[in-house]
């Protein structure tokens, strides 16, 4: 999963933006992260969130002179909140069939713009300038609309891949000593 997240981060840098959605990007990384949040136990989810946020910042934050608008590591916190929300639905993901997986995929797609809105809010706060236009709205909501179409297919692909390699998400059992 970690390799898929890294390759997806690289891949989505080269996907052209959607012109008819005013330059909205196609984002696969949140779908991979949210699937991992459903399939893995909490310690692995935290590692996945940390690496996803760190790699996202390292690949997307411009390194220039002057005061940075966005500090490396901020995306870790931004991804942590929706990942923990999704992780709360893990028992439903484990016990139910494909219909629950589809609903959870759409919930993950709805949470995708949250990450972009949080990034925009942090940058605007650092710059002390809250400029809002239709282009900005589309660049925040557009990836969510795209994710509503792509995330179920990403979940289906990852479910098939997990069955192929023999990984079955199981409920965590607490051991009493």
PLM feature segments, named:
Residues 1-177:
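Terminal, non-globular segments
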């Amino acid at each position: 999963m970690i390799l898929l997240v890294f390759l997806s981060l690289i891949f989505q840098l080269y996907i052209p933006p959607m012109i008819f959605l005013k330059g909205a990007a196609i984002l696969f990384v949140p779908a991979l992260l949210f699937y991992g949040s459903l399939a893995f136990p909490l310690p692995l989810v935290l590692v996945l969130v940390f690496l996803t946020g760190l790699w996202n910042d390292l690949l997307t934050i411009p390194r220039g002179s002057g005061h940075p608008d966005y500090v490396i590591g901020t995306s870790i916190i931004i991804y942590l909140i929706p990942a923990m929300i999704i992780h709360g639905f893990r028992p439903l993901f484990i016990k139910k069939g494909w219909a629950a997986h589809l609903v959870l995929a759409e919930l993950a797609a709805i949470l995708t713009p949250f990450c972009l809105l949080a990034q925009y809010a942090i940058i605007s706060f650092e710059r002390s300038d809250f400029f809002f236009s239709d282009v900005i709205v589309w660049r925040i909501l557009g990836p969510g609309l795209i994710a509503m179409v792509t995330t179920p297919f990403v979940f289906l692909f990852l479910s098939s891949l997990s069955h192929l390699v023999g990984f079955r998400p199981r409920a965590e059992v607490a051991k009493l000593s």
